[in-house]
Amino acid sequence: MHDDSEVAVLRLGHRPGRDERMTTHVGLTARALGADRVLFPDNAGQSLETVRDITDRFGGPFEAELTDSPHAVIRNWEGQVVHLTMYGERVQDVDAEIRTAHDSEGEALLLVVGSEKVSFDVYEEADWNVGVTNQPHSEVAGLAVFLDRLFEGRELEQDWADADRTVIPMETGKRVVPADDADEHHE
């Protein structure tokens, strides 16, 4: 997470009109579950703005940026590349190895999450092709499960710096307060 070697998420591909919500949720999930930044394709500007707005309101640290060359990001990444795909090795068989590379060896991780059909060169360039259940499902779900396994649940306890507001956990109802007032609302 934020004290460790970097974890970045690359959204590979974005179909305007079709992928707006999913691309945004890739970014929001990356932020909420411990990644340091997300890189969106350059045609995903609305997703970028939404993720930046949420980070401004609910805290960070987290960066969101656009890239005009996502394949170059993979090729030039200085660290390990994990491609999340339903065709990869089972997450439960490789998560410890990936965690060791990240935690013990200090390797930065780039998590690649596809949209449309992913070209074969991504499979070849990845250090790991990882499948969460090896069944068709949402790339957001795959990213969430992978990040939780990578951080072993530590991401669920993170503090949010520079937040304008804070959600107060409740059994029933919804409560959002100014961040400065959050401590007096926690039991």
Language-model features, listed with the residues they occupy:
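Short, well-ordered beta-strand core segments
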Residues: 38, 81, 129-131
